[in-house]
Amino acid sequence: GATSVEYIVSVADYVKEVLGQDIQDLKVAIVHEDGSYGTAVGEGNYAAAEEAGMDIVVYEAYSSSTLDLSSVIMKLIAAQPDVLLLTGYVNDGSLFVRQSAELGFTVPILITHSGGHSVQAFVDAVGDQVNYLLTVDPVPCNPKLDSFSEELQTVFQDFEARWTEKYGVKPAHHVEMRAFAQAYLFFTQVAPLAIEQSGTFSAASCRDAILSLDLDASQSLMGAGVKFSTPDEPFVDPVLGNSHVGQNIEAKAFINQYFDGELYCVWPEEYAQKEPVLFLPSSSSLSAGVVD
């Protein structure tokens, strides 16, 4: 949840140029589905926005099974936020887009958080309105390939070609990219190491191998290194302060954006395939019209 706020802070000068406001003057709305995923992201959004000094004007949870988000959207219309940080799944995510258009809700900056916003079903549901939506994901989608080793560039191109041939669409969403990247990492790094260390291939030997991994970002299609926290060295969340064991402390989140129905990495720069469009343009039904 913190990544979306970090991204906005990183482009503070551009925000000031367009909106005439410093980061501390931005009105931020945080809306999320009320399950464990949405709640965790929302808490991260809130903590990071609060730390950045932003004015949090809406902090609202809803059920992902809802058939009506009009009450939430009316609160947003009343609050007139500069930024909306939104987390949900496919059905509620597409419902939000549809009802926002019906009720006239617009916002200058909208950032979604993976989940249902980064899958083909969401694209199919909202059509062209998906374009220019920003989403925070655990992998860079359609990344700049020279960020990876030559070997991984070849592997990615082969994966993309085979997937596209079989399914008719590119693997341009976090689900496909993450599943392949993790499976490839397991079979090329974890499994061989487990057998080398113990002479066996088992759940226990794989666990030991995983905990001993220390890879840099160039060795993984995840766009991040691999080093897991242990009971002796737990990971402490820098935003929320929670202590975790078994977490990849090198993990990152990335900002992807839809262009012509496909997700492309736009931040951080070393993985960016396209330039980000921070403010929703007039072609979006959610655009507040601050840019053409």
Residue ranges, per PLM feature:
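Extracellular/periplasmic catalytic domains that process cell-envelope and extracellular macromolecules
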Residues: 22-23, 77-79, 102-104, 125-129, ...
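Extracellular/periplasmic periplasmic-binding protein-like sensory domains
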Residues: 1, 100-182, 269-271, 282-290
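Segments of small-molecule ligand-sensing domains
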Residues: 163-176, 188-265
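Alpha-helix termini
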Residues: 16-24, 123, 167, 194-198
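Flexible glycine/proline-enriched surface loops and loop-helix/loop-strand junctions
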Residues: 24-30, 81, 140, 165-172, ...
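Alpha-helical structural signal in soluble globular domains
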Residues: 44-52, 99-103, 121-125, 162, ...
